């Protein structure tokens, strides 16, 4: 009983954080105000559970189509992160972002793209992949390594008559 009480007390001292958004929107053409029937993220939620030097991070989204009324649950990211004194270690489904630029970043090519969201900013246009990553800090330098055991392909909008660009 004492061990269970101690375990419950230690979990109570952890930090829980979450944020999200609900975005019911409709895309219409400027030419004739007709509806563009493509999927969009109607809701998203990011959550985290921190206990000491260990984090559990999640990012989920609900993708919806107005024309069919279908909603699809999408687990965008879920990974465990450990932060020792020498760096960090992460394992799970992650979206890796390398570098920061105003447009397309030629070095940010680890994750596949979701072409339904190609005009969205940053990681919103990426798909998560199962991966292991680690950073090691040495003085003013950092060394990062990432292992992605299975190659994932881009999500292409083939057969979508409402997609504004033609696919090859």
PLM regions with names:
Residues 48-163:
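Outer membrane beta-barrel
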Residues 2-12:
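Sec-dependent N-terminal signal peptides
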Residues 164-168:
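Conformationally flexible catalytic loops at phosphate/diphosphate-handling active centers
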Residues 29-33, 65-68:
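A generic structural signal for short coil/turn motifs at secondary-structure boundaries
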Residues 15-30, 41, 54-58:
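Transmembrane beta-strand segments of Gram-negative outer membrane beta-barrel proteins
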Residues 1-2, 89:
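Generic cytosolic/nucleocytoplasmic N-terminal low-complexity/intrinsically disordered segments
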Residues 36-47:
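Short catalytic helix/loop segments, enriched in acidic residues and glycine
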